[in-house]
């Protein structure tokens, strides 16, 4: 496999499993997919962070709020790899419980990844809510 195929294999297995775990209340796998080396930035749909420690705190807060994920779909729009950097543009369609209340939402996401010691790590994430169809006309 080439770099892009190797990266997409990681994205579709390790990274996706970490997202499902987070939406079931377990931030541990997400910690493992994120860089602990500066710079790290998170412009989340609900919370933001500007360094690895703050990002970890955000993930702990999210995991405390999430439970009982019933659906998790990722629709990849674009992805590429150049050396030790990669990016994805995708939509995350999620059904989970937030503070005990069922919730469905779609996020538009752009992520940048760094290869660190041979492993891919998220270094930047920007996510926002998908506008309603009427808002996009």
Give the residues covered by each predicted segment.
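Residue-level recognition of conserved beta-strand positions in structured domain cores
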Residues: 44, 90-91, 124
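Hydrophobic/aromatic beta-strand elements that line small-molecule binding cavities or substrate pockets
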Residues: 59, 73-79, 91-94, 107-114, ...
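Short beta-strand edge/turn micro-motifs at domain boundaries
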Residues: 104-136
